[in-house]
């Protein structure tokens, strides 16, 4: 199943002594009376985490508008802020747009059309929930619509792995990753074809209502209309583009279902993004004029692909206030690390917590979702040691690394062991919300570690969205403001009862 969690947060602008005991400014009434679970100062702002206040699920055999399994959509979510409201009975409602990644791929990537799911959310707070008196799920998630994505000509996008070499282009667009497939792209008969490969991982809504979507294959950022047609494509600097044998190679070494033994040689790109480590993080400024996109972990020219060394992740900033996106700045985020309890070699045990999402905060800082892997529901291990929504903050000391030398194909800002070059200062990184606290999870019968049961947290938490506790109030400088942080998990379409209407394909996951 796909799961969702809601946390209560407070953001305080400026250095206010009142934040120590959680008191609001004079004349500003707090909407929640929860105790402070965690308080952190990052840059010039102080933040409070007041606990888990909501939980909901979607059955793993649910289907979308087109009859395909409603899975994987926790890759990223975006809330229509104008839709978020508090009802007279104290409940909350709003509309979320959620994006799945490239589809069910346990046995190989598929020719599944990329899509966005429109969801209705309803939250009924459970203020009396405790570990000894837990609440049932209190977040309702309802499918409202499914939007299919196409290229500029209206041809469906695909989740198939991109070709080892080559690309596809259209007037006014850069060369984009393409999959050339035989038959129907599922192993059956058909005419074959070529489609843009998309492994979507991030989504935001622009001021014009269009969707910006970040991708792992390119890694690129695409703009789609409300009808799902591609309008623009942002190609990042050459340093991000994967290259094998000195040539552009968009393949992620993820063979298709009809050719599961296909080999990619070399498997890892020598430079650029590593396989399945593309643009996981995408967010937009509060005024809708600036896009930020963050690579999941270090480029292979900056310390990747080894987990021990891939902690120096690059962030790009684009001005989207005009008709054409403009690349303006580039920064470094030094990702968190943790000790892998299952690694027998102590010299290899400290590894990078790759990030799965970023979210712009009203203060100008960012939330960043960093986590471990292979721990949780249906995973190899049940206990996760690192799942956090942390904070990153840019200051006057943060280095803008945008330059021709850093952005060229083999440009590097760190050693092969992930040590930043002299003179580069990354964004401040501050620990904040810990997903794994059983003292909070238990309020909704959830747990981290222990039995493989229906209450064990899913492995892949990959999305962040922020909505106000009091939707009638705007953000006030130097004031205390309260928000719900909504996070969805990506279940990778894991199910024993899956279906794809594309060719009446029925599937189940061996890992379930």
From Swiss-Prot:
Coiled coil region boundaries: none
Endpoints of the signal sequence: 1-22
Localization, UniProt: Secreted
GO cellular component assignments: extracellular region
InterPro entries: Phytase-like_dom (IPR027372)
Chief place of localization: secreted
SUPFAM superfamilies: YWTD domain (SSF63825)
Ranges where the record places region Disordered: 251-282
Keyword Secreted: yes
Keywords, in A-Z order: Glycoprotein, Secreted, Signal
Glycosylation positions in this chain: 167
Tree of life domain: Eukaryota
Record-linked PANTHER family: BLR7070 PROTEIN, PHYTASE-LIKE DOMAIN-CONTAINING PROTEIN
Record protein name field: Uncharacterized secreted protein ARB_04696
Organism: Arthroderma benhamiae (strain ATCC MYA-4681 / CBS 112371)
